[in-house]
Amino acid sequence: METNNEKSSLDPMFADAARLVVAEQDGSATRLQRHFEIGWNRACRLVEQLEAAGIVGSNRGAKGREVLIQDLAFLEQKLQEIEV
């Protein structure tokens, strides 16, 4: 479970990014960067936050990250647990 500091440090775009990643089954920073028109550093921070939340797996190099959640309904439940 995350502390209040960790929750408040989540990117304001975290929930939207999580929904996109699960819907598209693509956990890449490049996908987030292009879809949300954000910079590379912010996209990478979002991916790191998604990994910490258990939504995407760890970095696998050129293969990209595995999306660990397959279902949007389950994701919404997880987001409520995180209180996003």
PLM regions: where:
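C-terminal intrinsically disordered, low-complexity extensions immediately downstream
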Residues: M1-V84
